[in-house]
Amino acid sequence: AEGADNAVLWLPQQKVLISGDFFGPQFPQFPNIFTMRGEKVRKPVEYIKSLDRLIALNPDVILPSHLDPTIGAEKIRKGMQRIRDAVQYVHDETIAGMNAGKTVNQLMKEIKLPPNFELVQNHGRVDWAVKSIWEYYMGWFRFESTTELYPIPAQDVYADLAQIAGNENLIALANNYLIQGEPVKTLHITEIALAGDPQNASALALRDQALVELLERAENGLRNDYEIYWLKSQLDTAP
């Protein structure tokens, strides 16, 4: 969806737009600026321009490649305008934050759609779009750590950290984060603990509890399909 290779077919006499995957599986929804499934980078500004072209057609019917047709010129126009304005807003806010010297993680936390641009995010997500737009303009180097320049990730020293900190301290810290409602931080700490002791039962249990907490939040929140499928896959493959 939303990719540069997507083509649409316009039937002017019937005012029918055969949209393919241009809008994704649901209309309207926040699009995937860049998917997590290994596709090529999508250009946000070009997508906005394409939306402007489709809005100008003023279609009465949208026939997508997924789900049911959407019928009604006003409904379709408002839906396309909302998608365009939402993407434009996220794009512009990301650029403004970059120019202000903020990190990508700061912007992923801060940028939210205003109520008048609100869209479902079960396909694309705003915070992931922020990250995609950042990397589209900045590339892979985030200007945050010298270690980004070298093929030695933080995980390479996790076992050493586990040995120095001690599993008991790490487990206590991970559990404390979970109690405080910070399951992602729990995952960070359990990854360190498991690097030192891959079969540590307490670390494995805390990791699974953190994954379950994230899954419950996802299912009761944005209901993003990619996030839900990933979390389920991690629970399914847990030892």
Which residue ranges define each predicted feature?
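Metallo-beta-lactamase
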Residues: A1-M98
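Accessory terminal helices/loops
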Residues: A56-V61, P69-P239
